[in-house]
Amino acid sequence: DLHSFPTRRSSDLNLLNMVGHSYGNMSIMFYMINHGTDTTLPKLVKQVNIAGAFNGVIGIDEPDDVRLDDNGKPSIMNETYRALLNVQETYPENQVDVLNIYGDTGNGGDGSVTVKSAKSLRYLISDVAKSYQEIEIDGSDGRHSKLHETSKVDDPLIKFLWGK
């Protein structure tokens, strides 16, 4: 819950890792839009996005017939994605390692979020991130609700965050 995040830097919390699933990713992104340049707050060093609906949710607000260019830029952007473009002005340059995990059950998405919507994160932050990597989880483990309940996600997430 981002509402319980510290509002000022304390000696106990100087560095921060964030992990979001589904709409939790929007909380991370809007936190960075609103506070990404605030040096009084803990420094974000690692960000994990799981099943991020950056350019919409299937059947709700995802544009039809979206294509991504090589940089992850969607050919059509929904209203939320256009607001997320502001993160390009506030995201700390060469500071944050980013891991983007998404699912594909065989139909181009995880049942709630398309691969294209999840992969559109690349356009938002890969140019300023310290590193950016993507992992696709295929098959039944790639279902939206399963993505936070499988070792196919847990293992690379733990290795990314803690090097274990």
Which stretches of residues belong to each language-model region?
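Short, small-residue-biased leader/transition segments that mark boundaries at the very start
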Residues: L2-S10
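Soluble periplasmic/extracytoplasmic beta-strand elements of cell-envelope proteins
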Residues: N17-V19, Y102
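Phosphate/oxyanion-binding active-site loops and adjacent basic polyanion-contact surfaces
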Residues: S4, Y23-G24, E149-V153
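Gly/Ser-rich "nucleophile elbow"/oxyanion-hole loop immediately N-terminal to the catalytic nucleophile
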Residues: R9-N17
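Gly/Ala-rich beta-loop-alpha elbow adjacent to hydrolase catalytic centers
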Residues: V19-I28
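Helical cap/lid subdomain of alpha/beta-hydrolase-fold lipid enzymes
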Residues: M32-K164
